[in-house]
C-alpha cells in the first residue's frame, strides 16, 4: 500500500493576494498510479477535502465563487458525517459548484461511495439535461445548494443539477443508492426552496426527477423490491407541490410510474 498526503492553502496556480483561504486536502491509499484528479478553484473559502482508495478513479472538480465544499471523511467505509470517501475502482465524478455573487450561500457536495464503476456527474449552479447537455449558468447565481450521496454497489450512474437565481432560496438532495445498474437523473431549479430525498436499495431502476419553477416543491422517493421501477416525476409551476412514493415492485415485468404536478 502507499499513501499520498498533501495540503495546500490558497488557490492553486494563483497568488495569495488575489484569492485566499482555499484549502485542498487529499489522502490517497492504493497500489496504482492510475488516479486522475483535476481541481480548479477560483474565489474565497473554497474547500476540497477528499480521500481515495484503489485504482482508476477519475475526479474533476471546479469550484467558482466562494464557500464551496466537496467532502471528506477520515475513516474508510464509515461515511463519517456523510463526507467524501471513495473506496473502490473505476469511479468517475464530475463536480461543478458555482456562484457569481459577492456573497454566496454555499454549495456543498458530500459523498461516500464504496463500490466499482460508479459514474456521478452533478452540477450545482448549472442546469444539465438527462442527455448530459450542460446549459449556461444563470446570470444571478447565489448558491445555497446541498447534496449528500451514499452509493454502495457497482455500475451506478447518477446525473443531476441544482440551481436558482435568487439569494435566500436553497435546494437540497439527499440520496442513498445501494443497488447496481441504476440510471438516475435528478434536476432541481428555479426560485424557492426545493428538496428531494431518494432511497433506492435495489437494482436496474430508471429514475427521472425534475422539480422546477418559482414554488417550493418537495419529493420523497423510496424504491425497493425484487424488480425495477421506471419513475418519471415532474413538479413545476407557481404553486407548491409535494410528492412521496414508496414502491416495492413485485412485477416480474417491472413497474412504471409517471407523475406530472403543476403547470
Where would I find each of the regions flagged by the language model?
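Sec-dependent signal peptide recognition
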Residues: 2-13
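Sec/Tat signal peptide C-region and signal peptidase I cleavage site
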Residues: 14-20
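N-terminal hydrophobic targeting signals that begin at the initiator methionine
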Residues: 1-2, 22
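Extracellular/surface-exposed low-complexity segments
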Residues: 4, 16, 260-263
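Low-complexity repeat regions of mature extracellularly deployed or surface/particle-associated proteins
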Residues: 21-263
